[in-house]
Amino acid sequence: EKMNRAKEVAGKEPIFQILPYEHKKVGIVTTGSEVYHGRIQDTFTPVIVDKVTEYGAEIEGHEICDDNPEMIEDAIHDLLRRGCNMILCTGGMSVDPDDRTPLAIKNVTGNVVSYGAPVLPGAMFLLAYTKDGKPIMGLPGCVMYAKRTIFDLVLPRVMADVPVTKADLAKMGAGGLC
């Protein structure tokens, strides 16, 4: 009786699905004057490479940019032209006046799903999609240090070509911690 009721409530939609990960060519844009001018080493990119290659993605390109929105936009456009179907931007994601990555992503896509997520670590996460549906993510610094962040919650969906909405991100806030 309970199983019949469960079937009735579920309707024709599956209760859950297992979707395959799609092959992604990933472009990484590292921003920040400190890295661009060689004052500090880029320690973020190796972390990102490890995370995305776990899903079978390949790194198609990596650009290092100064804190200049036009330079960041050019790097994103260049990676898209080179065939990248996912762009990950590191650096410049906080609220400092010289953090220009969110502006550059907005200018490229015009379609920011969310700048900010109700999940810690990762509150300054940004998700956007290009007009043809390619995801561009702005990753906060915590992704470099914390074992699990909002990026680790979103990445499997993106790798399976499941569009992530603002409502999806809001639902991840139940509990608020990764």
Regions found by a protein language model. Give the residues of each.
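Short, glycine/charged-enriched hinge/interface segments at domain edges or termini
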Residues: 1-60
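Short glycine/threonine-rich loop/turn motifs
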Residues: 33, 43, 57-178
